[in-house]
């Protein structure tokens, strides 16, 4: 990944976190299009050579004490399929929470030309928090990177909450300025 592309991703994440327009220049190359949920703040972010991650929590919560969380991850250069990633994630969840059932696939179809999958994992009682943890995942296999957005609850969400967050995940997408059929939207100047 070039330094310029890393800077663009950081700008998109930074401006999305504060609800502003994505950037003053058009997006270049492959990008994850995701916004910070209204009423959420950045609780944690980390950048490593092969991955960037941002965790959003409700404005009055922290990543140490949360009831809801949205996690956005970009794995640079990862060539896994959404199915492979889901299988690995489910295996890791079962190791941490023996009560986890199999991953439940919600959607498995290309979006904007990219292999995409949405699934659910449910831990009835997380051994670390002693609370339930229910998480929906949306994974997109890009050409340059692998993208994952998670919505987690530490309680049983209502049907209205599930509908709201499925709508949020539907809006998450990947674009690429180098491929006409997958072009990125023009940003505000």
Predicted region positions:
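Bacterial N-terminal signal peptides
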Residues: 10-17
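Short, cysteine-centered beta-strand-loop-beta hairpins and adjacent loop/turn segments enriched
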Residues: 63-65, 124-131, 156-157
